[in-house]
Amino acid sequence: FGMDMTVISGVEKTIKELWQLDDWTHGFAMATALYGTVIGAAFGGIPADKLGRKKNLFWIGLSFLISSIGAALANDVNSFMIFRFLGGLGIGASSVVAPIYISEIAPAKHRGKLVISFQLNIVLGILIAYVSNYFLNGLGENDWRYMLAIVALPSLLFSILILFTPESPTFLLLHRNDLENAKKILSLVDTEAD
């Protein structure tokens, strides 16, 4: 989600001029994703407990995908804010659900490193956003749309790849009482598990 949060830095001045926003509306529009982030973080764990970590992560990936494409295609500030808010919901939810999923599926000896890699990947996303903004800047009057749309690429990749990962064995045990499948998944991810 680092890329989704940071990419806005390359488009905010253009959007202010394009839609002739006053300072208050401009600030509100730029912060809309943050409002979604708070709500997503507060409530993102609920569907993870009901649907499963994997399904929730899939929907989070789709929210990033829809948000990036929708914001890139927005023709007014209101639709832009709706799509940025949706992306913010995904950011907030992912900040809760992804570390839970990683910690529940990772073998004990690698758990710390893998949970830390989540934060490292956020920072990597921030870097990629700044670099992509740099290279996309100046590509014409729609360069701001390209900057927002580029987030769709990792979002799509994530949404596809999550389909090939197993569900959290902890979720299967605690919420589905499925000991058999939980053991199968544990044997796949941790060959040294008892």
Please annotate each region the language model reported:
Residues 1-194:
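Transmembrane-helix signature of 12-pass secondary carriers
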